[in-house]
Amino acid sequence: TEFGIVVELGATKIRRKLAELEGDEAYPQNIRLMAQCVREQVGMLDQRLAECERQIARQSKNDPVVARLRSRPGIGLLSADAIVATVGDARQFKNGRQFAASLGITPRQHGSGGKTHLGAITRRGDSYLRCLFVQGARCVLQAALRLHKNKPDTLNRLQLWMVKLNDRVGYHKAAVAIANKHARQVWAMLTRGETYNADAYKDWEAAHANVCPGDIHRASDDDLSTAALAAASV
């Protein structure tokens, strides 16, 4: 603006800046009144959003499917409710790969000379669900990175995989890969009525001690439970 006011992106930063402008007498009165008006509008929007979230929580309180999905880290109330409302019967997808592809979080494939190359994600399908999955993936990735920095000895198997993936391909690609994994696991949870268990892979590996890791990765989603998918993640 003509007053050189710059506001960083982010709801918290905007609220903080508006409060600063409102109380800064270095700016004209009309600028401070405008900041107050905008701050009040933001407050009203916050109240409406909070009421919408409470309404969704009331509607989903007794929904066992929503409860199962929320057991998966990275899947919150809004994401679980949106998945249930949008996907419907997950059995319409042959496997978890198809479900992830329907959200546009699988890489494009193109071949030349008998070789297959993977490109950027397709970005097809429901953009809102894709956004929710990616945001959830970012949350769990950030949590894993913070834990790796402060208490690396407490990382679990899946968090260690996330940290290594982030080091190998970078933050944004890692987040999309994690979102893809979440989508495949959500498909398994929906079709089998399973609750997520981060340690379930231990029982699965004990029962399949003679199966090499490569066989796990080559198996189809129809042959894998959420426990096996967790084991295949690493």
Show which residues each predicted segment covers.
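A detector of single, family-specific signature residues
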Residues: 1-234
